[in-house]
Structures are given as structure tokens and as C-alpha cells.
Curated annotation (Swiss-Prot):
This is Glutamine synthetase. The modification O-AMP-tyrosine is found at Y400. The lineage of its organism: Archaea, Thermoproteota, Thermoprotei, Sulfolobales, Sulfolobaceae. GO terms for cellular component: cytoplasm; membrane. The gene is glnA. The activity of this enzyme is controlled by adenylation under conditions of abundant glutamine. The fully adenylated enzyme complex is inactive.
Length: 471
């Protein structure tokens, strides 16, 4: 991939590129694009950027009276778009118009600031998200006249309600079935092939997940904060486009199906010395999980701020339909070795492997903005390190099966049960974010999410009529 402006121009010429997609991310986390002629690219434009953006039309960006904005390509993200011959794409940084500098609510800017902050503190960090998703044949929505009622119907060839006449996957029985029961393996493989060949990924695994109706997962090799966030956005973009080519619909919403597992983005995290030579999470003399005291402080910070983090890593009303007991989703704020009923799991596959020592933070889902999510996780972790926050003892039991009294005795709290509750927590616990998250991004994010929650609260749910029509 290109690394300089000169490389970009060479890449465009050698690949006979006619059009370039300028892509950027809004505050909630949606990817946007504008397509421009490749012949607009020259050394000057790659230095000054492209004045192509009306920021007043992008959620969380600007008002109509200050709407002119500039997109500056990031050369190392320039790649071919394999399903669009003659077209390339590049991720962009967002700047104010008029030479006023970097736009402070650009999510990628927040992630870049987080990386700078950790470097100043003497650390580097690595992230390994596990992206789950559903792949449906079709989704029908009925929302055109919400006053008369709303509804939806999911069509999925693997689902128990399917009339496809082929194998179905029962609820909660979708983990690792071999083909032909796993009917969508070939599409997942095409997605990861595309990521490897055109976008430079190292893929660790792809497989069917626990839920029915085409739930899958893709795991790629861990990387640094900004690069991993770029990769999350790119993976979602590629998966949706490859699926669409096959007439399928990929969704990363956390809980599209009642009664089955939701979609998460469990995130593996480790902190190292700034030069990347020593894993600070690792202690070979720790008998419990080879986790160092430094690593325990990281855990302490994440647990302390877990309720506030929920507003960022579980950012939609739908997220809290996933975060309920009984569906392998984290609910209880505790940590443990190899325990998937806790918010934080210390993977325990091997011993004596410094490079592999990490923690897994389980609450995130892929509806999050990855730039903000990874930056927030880092800030919570560093707060734990700087304040030496002890996480307490690990809980080596199935926390779902503990009585409320037992959980109280162990001091185990719960994650928020709604987006509004999570936003309340973020408003009361955001000081740890402020070295990186400016007040503009925090206030804008909270306002956007309050509006989202308020809007959805106004719609009667179809099941409410089932339960209450005879009141």
C-alpha cells in the first residue's frame, strides 16, 4: 500500500484508477464517502486536502453557518475497490475549512490523540477485536407510517422459520457447524479473501457463531489503536459489499433476533513499553493467570469505569437487548481467568507466552464507533495504571448463577440496563477521558445519543400490542 503522496500518485497511475472514494467516519460511527475523479490528485491536493464536505449534513459535525470542511487522505489507507473496477478508496482526516486546523470532533482525531497520549506516558497498546455479524437473505421493514404501526420480518436460509427446504440451525446451536449446515461459509471466505488480497489484513479465523440465521465472526491480527479502528471500519464496509453482491444483507446491529445470542465485538487489549519490546501485562511468576500487577491495574481501571464506558462501547438502544443474562453476553462487572460470564476475561489458552498475554473486554458490540471505543478503553486502562486501581479478587464462578445476595457480598455490580442509564454514568464519570476527549466531542456525542434514545422511546413496540391490547 502507498505510504507517501508520491506513492499515491504512482498507485493511481499503475492501477489505471479513474475514480477515488474519499471515506470518513461520523461521530456515531457510520462510514461516509464522496467519489471524485482520480485526476484531481496531485502533490498539492494531497498536502492541502479536498474541500468537498458539507459538515452540516453529517451527524455530530458542524452547523450550517460553518459547514465548509476539508478531507485529507491518509496515504497508507489507499486501496483498490475490487468490486468496482477502476475505483480506489482512501480513508481521510477531517479539517475545518478556512485553514482553521483539525476538526476536533473527527473520531479518527480522537484516536490519534489517544495514541499520542499513551506515547507521552511511555506505552503502546494493541487491540484485537472479534467482529460478529448476521448475514440475512432479506429484511422487510414496515416503518413508512409509524402512526398505524411498525414491523419487520427477517428472511434467513439457516433459520428455524425458514422455508428454504435445507438444513436449519436451531437457536443457540450455531457454533462451528460444518457445511452443509453452515450454508454461508463460502461468502465469509470471500470476505476474508478480499480483506487479505486487497486490504492487507492478516486473518486469524472466520467461523459460524452461536446464533442461528447466519451469524458469523471474523478475527484479524491485533494492531495499534488507530490502525485497528481503521480495520474495523474497513471490515464492515467489505463484508456489507461482498454480501450485497450475493444478494445478502450483513448487519452489525447487536440484537436483531429475539431468543438467540446477540452480536458482540469482544476486544482484546494489551499494553507494552513504548518501544513495543516488553508486554507489561505479563508476569511469568503469577500463578493465577500470569498477569502482572500492572495488568491488574489495567483491569482495575476498566472495571471502575465500565458503567461509563458502556455509553461508548454499547452505544445504541438495541445494544441493551444484547446485554442480558443467558446469551453469553457480559452483565456483571468482574474479572476472571477464562470466564466468559465476567466483563473481563484473562485468556488462559497457554502458559509461558509473553506475546499472547492480554485481557478481553467483553461488553463492546460492533455498532460502536471503533475510534472512540478503543480510545476510551485505553483511557480507562491508563487511569487504572496511574491511580493503581486494584481490581479485587477474580471471580471463578458462573456469575449468572450467583444469587443477588452472593453478588452483593462479592461487590459485583451490573452494567447499565439501558442507553439512557449508560449516558447518565458517562456524564457523571468522564474525567478519565478528558486528557484525550475534548468537551466538544463528549457533549456532542451525549446529545446525539440522548436524542436517539428519546426518539425510539416514542414508538410503541409491536409486542406491546400483543401484551396490552386487551387492557
Amino acid at each position: 500500500m502507498p505510504s507517501t503522496a508520491e506513492d499515491v500518485l504512482k498507485f493511481l497511475k499503475e492501477n489505471n484508477i479513474k475514480w477515488v472514494d474519499l471515506q470518513f467516519t461520523d461521530v456515531p460511527g457510520r462510514l461516509h464517502h464522496i467519489t471524485i475523479p482520480a485526476d484531481e490528485f496531485d502533490l498539492e491536493s494531497l498536502k492541502t486536502g479536498f474541500g468537498k464536505l458539507d459538515g452540516s449534513s453529517i451527524r455530530g459535525f458542524t452547523s450550517i453557518y460553518e459547514s465548509d470542511m476539508v478531507l485529507l487522505p491518509v496515504p497508507e489507507t489507499m486501496t483498490l475497490i475490487p468490486w468496482s473496477p477502476g475505483v480506489a478508496r482512501v480513508l481521510c482526516k477531517v479539517f475545518w475549512g478556512g485553514g482553521k486546523g483539525r476538526f476536533e470532533r473527527d473520531p479518527r482525531f480522537i484516536a490519534e490523540e489517544a495514541e499520542k497520549y499513551q506515547t507521552e506516558q511511555g506505552y503502546t497498546s494493541y487491540y484485537g477485536p472479534e467482529l460478529e455479524f448476521f448475514m440475512f437473505d432479506k429484511v422487510k421493514l414496515d416503518v413508512s407510517a409509524p402512526q398505524s404501526g411498525t414491523g419487520y420480518k427477517i428472511y434467513a436460509r439457516e433459520a428455524p422459520w425458514s422455508d428454504s427446504g435445507t438444513f436449519v440451525i436451531r437457536f443457540k446451536e450455531g457454533y462451528y457447524p460444518a457445511p452443509p449446515v453452515d450454508q454461508l461459509m463460502d461468502v465469509r471466505v470471500e470476505i476474508v479473501d478480499t480483506l487479505v488480497k486487497y486490504f492487507g489484513y492478516t486473518i486469524e479465523a472466520t467461523h459460524h457463531e452461536v446464533a442461528t440465521a447466519g451469524q458469523g465472526e471474523i478475527d484479524f491480527r491485533f494492531s495499534t489503536l488507530v490502525d485497528t479502528a481503521d480495520k474495523v471500519q474497513t471490515l464492515k464496509y467489505v463484508a456489507k459489499n461482498i454480501a450485497a453482491k450475493h444478494g445478502l444483507v450483513v448487519t452489525f446491529m447487536p440484537k436483531p433476533i429475539y431468543g438467540d445470542n446477540g452480536t458482540g465485538m469482544h476486544t482484546h487489549l494489551s499494553l507494552w513499553t513504548k518501544d513495543g519490546k516488553k508486554n507489561l501485562m505479563y508476569d511469568p511468576n503469577d500463578e493465577y493467570a500470569e498477569i502482572s500487577q500492572f495488568g491488574r491495574y489495567v483491569i482495575g481501571g476498566l472495571l471502575t469505569h465500565a458503567r461509563a464506558l458502556s455509553a461508548i462501547v454499547s452505544p445504541t438502544v438495541n445494544s441493551y437487548r444484547r446485554l442480558i443474562p443467558g446469551f453469553e453476553a457480559p452483565v456483571y462487572i468482574a474479572w476472571s481467568k477464562g470466564n466468559r460470564s465476567a466483563v473481563i476475561r484473562v485468556p488462559a489458552y497457554y502458559r509461558g507466552m509473553e506475546k499472547a498475554k492480554r485481557i478481553e473486554y467483553r461488553p463492546p458490540d460492533p455498532s460502536t464507533n471503533p475510534y472512540l471505543a478503543f480510545a476510551a478503553l485505553l483511557m480507562a486502562a491508563l487511569d487504572g495504571v496511574n491511580k493503581k486501581i486494584d481490581p479485587g479478587d477474580p471471580v471463578d464462578e458462573n456469575i449468572y448463577h450467583l444469587t443477588p445476595e452472593k453478588r452483593r457480598q462479592l461487590g459485583i455490580k451490573e452494567l447499565p440496563r439501558s442507553l439512557n442509564e449508560a449516558l447518565d454514568e458517562l456524564e457523571s464519570d468522564k474525567e478519565f477521558l478528558k486528557p484525550v476527549f475534548n468537551s466538544s466531542i463528549l457533549d456532542t456525542y451525549i446529545d446525539l445519543k440522548r436524542d436517539e434514545a428519546r426518539s425510539l422511546q416514542g414508538y410503541p413496540h409491536p409486542m406491546e400490542l400483543y401484551y396490552y391490547l386487551d387492557s
